[in-house]
């Protein structure tokens, strides 16, 4: 196609992108470069991926290790805001898209590409996230979205397309799931999940065991938090990615972090997905425990507002925006005092903070005790209550006055 000489494809080796390489070769007179982002997905997914991309028709395959950058620069800032989409979704796929798109744009510019391509469907959120990032970072790049162009409409069509071209793929007609994994989570959609009346089979879950099959004894883990970031597990300092992978393994064995939700997509439809975020669920519990100790009431309320707004920004693909930067800056300021240690209990699908302390804690046992104390004069509460309820008292007095025929105009 005129004006396009080199295309960088976001390549996973999965069903969609396995079909896109030959499709691009057949429909565009351009060089195809496969770009693989390692954000902590299953190691099996990366094994032999360069050879597979070349065999599928790519002239080159770039594999970029983004694991530490993903957790440090995208997961941790999101955790500080407290963002949770629609009350349950910890934004695993949403957070990964901007780091992938940014690295992909950098690769496209370095390779002198004219366009990028992705395997996102025309029904999903990811097309908006990828293309929104490109628009913000390199608007001169063209975007090719095969799912919005070709005549294939189902995963079955793609399997047939690949079979005629002798291109291998793990997906089968018997087990058709759409999965997305990174260091933070793994999501599963499709198959029996397309009916909300179907209970997910155990084949859906990859990282976690059923709660009823989890160990009968709880496991405890101690997390150290510094300025709103988890920096150590059981007093052992680790990198952000190492911390997450460690917690994924330990929490997954106890069935922690499973959710089955039906969410509102950006494009207007609802979708159902089963998400597993074992380590992330533990980290969130630890950070909330430290917040409970450190943040005063108005600061915590503000942080909750930040989280609500940020969850939509991340979900909607608006990471590279001024508002996103402003919210992250505000969350970082709040997190400056979020230092502490938390012991969490993992048991039968649940995680609970059972011990917590912070050098910046506003909790005082002397003030909070239900026993005798020497620091709090309870008579002081009377004056506070009179001022706190003053507006209510004035309103009630005026209503009483009006009810007996008093002056309705006097202010």
From Swiss-Prot:
> Does the keyword field hold Signal?
no
Instruction: Please give the Gene Ontology molecular function terms for this protein.
Output: argininosuccinate synthase activity; ATP binding
Q: Which domain of life is it from?
A: Bacteria
One record GO biological process:
argininosuccinate metabolic process
Q: How does it assemble?
A: Homotetramer.
- Origin species, per record, is Aeromonas hydrophila subsp. hydrophila (strain ATCC 7966 / DSM 30187 / BCRC 13018 / CCUG 14551 / JCM 1027 / KCTC 2358 / NCIMB 9240 / NCTC 8049)
Q: Where in the cell is it found?
A: Cytoplasm
Q: What is this protein called?
A: Argininosuccinate synthase
Q: What class of enzyme is it?
A: ligase
Q: What is its EC number?
A: 6.3.4.5
- Where on this chain does ATP bind? 10-18, 37, 119
């Amino acid at each position: 196609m005129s004006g396009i000489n080199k295309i960088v494809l976001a390549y996973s080796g999965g069903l969609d992108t396995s079909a896109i390489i030959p499709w691009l070769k057949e429909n565009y007179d351009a060089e195809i470069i496969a770009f693989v982002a390692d954000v902590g997905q299953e190691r099996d997914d990366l094994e032999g991926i360069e050879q597979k991309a070349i065999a599928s028709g790519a002239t080159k395959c770039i594999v970029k290790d983004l694991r530490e950058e993903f957790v440090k620069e995208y997961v941790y800032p999101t955790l500080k805001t407290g963002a949770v989409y629609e009350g349950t979704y910890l934004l695993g796929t949403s957070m990964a898209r901007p780091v992938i798109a940014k690295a992909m744009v950098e690769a496209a510019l370095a390779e002198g590409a004219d366009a990028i391509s992705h395997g996102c469907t025309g029904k999903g959120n990811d097309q908006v996230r990828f293309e929104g990032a490109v628009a913000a970072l390199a608007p001169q790049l063209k975007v090719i979205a095969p799912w919005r162009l070709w005549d294939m409409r189902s995963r079955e069509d793609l399997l047939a397309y690949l079979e005629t071209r002798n291109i291998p793929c793990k997906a089968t007609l018997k087990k058709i799931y759409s999965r997305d994994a990174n260091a933070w989570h793994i999501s599963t959609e499709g198959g029996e999940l397309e009916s909300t009346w179907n209970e997910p089979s155990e084949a859906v879950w990859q990282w976690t065991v059923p709660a009823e099959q989890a160990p009968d004894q709880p496991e405890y883990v101690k997390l150290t938090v510094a300025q709103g970031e988890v920096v150590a597990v059981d007093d052992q300092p680790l990198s952000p990615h190492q911390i997450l992978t460690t917690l994924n393994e330990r929490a997954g064995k106890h069935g922690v972090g499973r959710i089955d939700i039906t969410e509102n997509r950006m494009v207007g439809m609802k979708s159902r997905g089963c998400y597993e975020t074992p380590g992330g669920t533990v980290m969130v519990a630890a950070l909330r425990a430290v917040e409970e100790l450190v943040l005063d009431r108005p600061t915590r309320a503000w942080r909750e507002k930040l989280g609500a707004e940020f969850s939509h920004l991340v979900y909607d693909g608006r990471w590279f925006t001024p508002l996103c930067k402003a919210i992250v800056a505000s969350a970082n300021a709040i997190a400056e005092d979020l230092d502490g240690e938390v012991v969490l209990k993992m048991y039968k699908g649940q995680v609970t903070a059972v011990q917590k302390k912070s050098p910046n804690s506003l909790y005082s046992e002397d003030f909070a005790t239900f026993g005798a104390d020497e620091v709090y004069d309870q008579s002081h509460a009377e004056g506070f209550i009179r001022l706190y309820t003053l507006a209510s008292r004035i309103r009630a007095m005026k209503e009483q006055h009006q009810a007996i025929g008093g002056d309705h105009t006097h202010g």
